[in-house]
Regions:
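Core transmembrane helices of Major Facilitator Superfamily
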Residues: 30, 115-127, 332-343
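Extracytoplasmic gate region of multi-pass secondary transporters
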Residues: 37-41, 232-284
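Helix-breaking motifs and short loop linkers at transmembrane-helix boundaries and internal kinks
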Residues: 49, 81, 102-108, 136, ...
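Conserved MFS/SLC helix-loop-helix module at the cytosolic interface between two early adjacent transmembrane helices
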Residues: 68-106, 293, 299
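Paired small-residue
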Residues: 96, 107-115, 323-331
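Cytoplasmic helix-loop-helix junction between adjacent transmembrane helices
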Residues: 112-150
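Helix-loop-helix hairpin linking two adjacent transmembrane segments in secondary transporters
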Residues: 146-201
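C-terminal transmembrane helical hairpin of 12-TM major facilitator-type secondary transporters
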Residues: 278-286, 291-346
């Protein structure tokens, strides 16, 4: 039936539909579920009477949940198909956000932020990994780069929406924000289940860019060489590099709005506008850097992005006036989601379309460890020093370590022998 509806003669390849829905999944799973906290944090922190350490602890709880499910979610997607895993993950994330809005204490909020993170991990990793099945190798960087812009659209929407909701609902504005995020995410879960397909062969199609006459056969789960994921030295190297991104960027993103308000002299509305500007600049980052990695290599792109982000974080810490904050936001926006896009494309290169979600889930374990540690460490440093600047400088230093680690990657990460498509 589906093969008749979505025929090979359709004017638009269904891979583009998959990419559009995948971008929407990222919008909810990361954009609303994780970065929504950045915009809501000042009001939520005041409403619940949280210290900086506790505020960082809520972010850490969310990221521990993400870490717990990202590896399992990727493996489940490889075995049972991304469609059902993505749908279930978004549903769990929506429930977690709804309950976050009902929280009355740090303990309640931490529990529900962890549940939200679990749903995010179970949906985001398979959504990006799914692109490896729908796009041939030479287009995977581009596709992943577009997919991660879901977070960019979220920054734009959050920058516009949250200040108005906070103004309109007063003391309970932060709760209403979480309710809105939950409703959007639940709707996306239903939409994703309706539209997503696990692989081109489900519709009698080939991956976008594949030559005519290529086989549409898929490998069954029991025939997959699972050990190729966990025994690959290159995959472990990628994971270790990914730690640096997780640790550094989440410090910047978690405390971005709070730093602007408490140390940069911004109002909530002005901070929201700068958050939106960051989102606009980040719209093309995955597309640009994904294409750069397709043309110049994954290694070159990773080194360049880490250096740009290290400079953005240090600028934010050392120049907390309007010009410095704006330049920092622009630089980070230009490179924001490029590292996840490059990592997703690299996993597709190394492991093939069926194992790509499992590989991405595995290296996301390392990424998640960095993310889980970052906000808590930053909050402790901020409470001890009474400023967020030292924590931001730490983020900058860790990003530089990521650049150094990337220099030791092989120049050509393509066509390795670890997979058999």
């Amino acid at each position: 039936m589906q093969k008749d509806i979505f025929s090979k003669t359709a004017p638009v390849h269904y891979a583009w539909v998959i990419l559009a829905v995948g971008t929407l999944v990222v919008f909810c799973a990361l954009g609303l579920a994780r970065f929504g906290y950045t915009m809501v944090l000042p009001a939520m922190q005041a409403g619940l009477g949280l210290s900086n350490t506790q505020a960082g602890g809520l972010a850490t709880a969310n990221l521990i949940g993400y870490l717990a499910l990202s590896v399992i979610g990727g493996a489940l997607a490889a075995r049972y198909g991304p469609r059902i895993v993505i749908t279930a993950g978004l549903t769990v994330a929506a429930a977690g956000m709804l309950l976050t809005g009902l929280s009355d204490s740090f303990a309640d909020a931490a529990a529900w932020r962890a549940i939200t993170g679990m749903g995010s991990g179970a949906s985001n990793v398979p959504a990006i990994g799914l692109l490896a099945a729908w796009f041939v190798q030479r287009r995977r960087g581009l596709a992943a780069g577009i997919g991660v812009t879901g977070s960019s659209f979220a920054l734009i929407v959050l920058g516009l929406l949250v200040p108005h909701v906070l103004d309109g609902y007063g003391w309970n504005g932060w709760r209403m924000c979480w309710f809105i995020f939950a409703g959007i995410t639940l709707g996306t879960a239903v939409f994703s289940f309706t539209i997503l397909r696990n692989c081109p062969s489900d519709l009698g199609l080939l991956p976008l860019g594949a030559p005519k006459g290529s086989s549409t056969a898929t490998v069954v789960a029991r025939e997959l060489n699972w050990s190729s994921v966990y025994r690959s030295g290159v995959v472990w190297h990628l994971g270790l590099i990914y730690v640096a991104f997780g640790f550094s960027y989440i410090i910047y993103m978690t405390f971005f709005t709070k730093y602007l308000i408490t140390e940069g002299g911004y109002t909530q509305g002005a901070a929201g506008r700068l958050f939106m500007i960051m989102g606009w600049f980040s719209l093309l980052c995955g597309l640009v850097w994904g294409s750069v990695s397709d043309r110049l290599g994954r290694k070159t792109a990773l080194v360049a992005v880490y250096i740009i982000q290290a400079f953005a974080f240090s600028l934010f810490a050392l120049w907390p006036s309007s010009p410095g904050c704006v330049l920092s936001a622009v630089l980070f926006g230009f490179s924001a989601w490029s590292i996840p896009a490059i990592m997703a494309a690299t996993c597709g290169d190394l492991l093939g379309p069926r194992l790509a979600p499992a590989g991405l889930g595995f290296i996301t374990l390392f990424f998640g460890i960095g993310q889980a540690a970052g906000p808590g460490v930053a909050g402790i440093i901020a409470d001890a020093s009474q400023t967020l600047s030292p924590a931001l400088l730490l983020a900058s230093g860790v990003a530089l370590l990521g650049a150094v680690g990337s220099l030791f990657l092989r120049s050509d990460l393509r066509q390795q022998s670890v997979h058999a498509d």
